[in-house]
């Protein structure tokens, strides 16, 4: 059972093919979700964007 646990145990730090530890903060930028990025993705999409209708918030008496 100990052998199986030693195989399944993940390393505490990600490593590359050679076994050297990777510095994730320096090597890879974090994925940022912004309105500008989302608009660019929507404009490049092959599907037409669905337009949302704004509801009138004023109460009709």
From Swiss-Prot:
Membrane topology type: Lipid-anchor
UniProt modification remark: Myristoylation and palmitoylation (probably on one or more of the nearby cysteines at the N-terminus) enable membrane-binding and Golgi apparatus-specific targeting and are essential for efficient packaging. Phosphorylated. Phosphorylation does not seem to be required for recycling to the host Golgi apparatus. Packaging is selective for underphosphorylated forms.
Subcellular compartments: Virion tegument; Virion membrane; Host cell membrane; Host Golgi apparatus membrane
UniProt KW keywords: Host cell membrane, Host Golgi apparatus, Host membrane, Lipoprotein, Membrane, Myristate, Palmitate, Phosphoprotein, Virion, Virion tegument
GO process annotations (BP): viral budding from Golgi membrane
Q: Which organism is it from?
A: Human herpesvirus 8 type P (isolate GK18)
Q: Which family does it belong to?
A: Belongs to the herpesviridae cytoplasmic envelopment protein 3 family.
Q: How does it assemble?
A: Interacts with cytoplasmic envelopment protein 2; this interaction is essential for the proper localization of each protein to the assembly complex and thus for the production of infectious virus.
Q: Which residues form a coiled coil?
A: none
- Protein name (database record): Cytoplasmic envelopment protein 3
Q: Where is lipid attached as N-myristoyl glycine?
A: 2
Pfam families per UniProt? Herpesvir_UL11
The record's Gene Ontology cellular component field reads:
host cell Golgi membrane; host cell plasma membrane; membrane; viral tegument; virion membrane
Its function, per the record, reads: Plays an important role in the cytoplasmic envelopment of tegument proteins and capsids during the assembly and egress processes. Also participates in viral entry at the fusion step probably by regulating the core fusion machinery.
């Amino acid at each position: 059972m100990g052998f199986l646990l030693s195989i399944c145990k993940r390393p505490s730090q990600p490593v590359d093919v050679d076994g050297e530890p990777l510095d994730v903060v320096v090597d890879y930028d974090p994925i940022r979700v912004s309105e500008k990025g989302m608009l660019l993705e929507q404009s490049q999409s092959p599907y037409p964007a669905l337009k949302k209708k704004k509801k009138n918030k004023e109460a009709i008496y």
